Amino acid sequence: MIGLNHYLIVSGLLFCIGLAGMLKRKNILLLFFSTEIMLNAINIGFVAISKYTHNLDGQMFALFIIAIAASEVAIGLGLVILWFKKYKSLDIDSLNAMKG
């Protein structure tokens, strides 16, 4: 039987993979993907704890995180597309070219 520890280990590993992606990558699109992996890892942890404590709070938090992640993707990808059209690069180092 799969216990709470197994879910939390998978959640922790996914979060570490997402964090490593955030720290290592210089591509804006890959940073978005890494953020999504981290948010999904948090969702797995919330839902697993919610199931084993018979409390729905974790599942409600997971739904809020899914909604926030969807809005992040919609707005973020729109900005990435505009950035690529203007600068022809998705490299983080090109962010220094911003003037404002």
Swiss-Prot record:
Q: Where are the transmembrane segments?
A: 1-21, 28-48, 64-84
Q: Which reaction does it catalyse?
A: a quinone + NADH + 5 H(+)(in) = a quinol + NAD(+) + 4 H(+)(out)
What does the record give as EC number? 7.1.1.-
Q: How does it sit in the membrane?
A: Multi-pass membrane protein
Alphabetical GO CC annotations of the entry are: NADH dehydrogenase complex; plasma membrane
According to the UniProt entry, where is the signal peptide?
A: none
InterPro entries per the UniProt record, alphabetical: NADH_UbQ_OxRdtase_chain4L/K, NUOK/Mnh_C1-like
Indicate where this protein resides in the cell.
Cell inner membrane
Family membership: Belongs to the complex I subunit 4L family.
Protein's recorded name: NADH-quinone oxidoreductase subunit K
List the taxonomic lineage.
Answer: Bacteria, Pseudomonadati, Campylobacterota, Epsilonproteobacteria, Campylobacterales
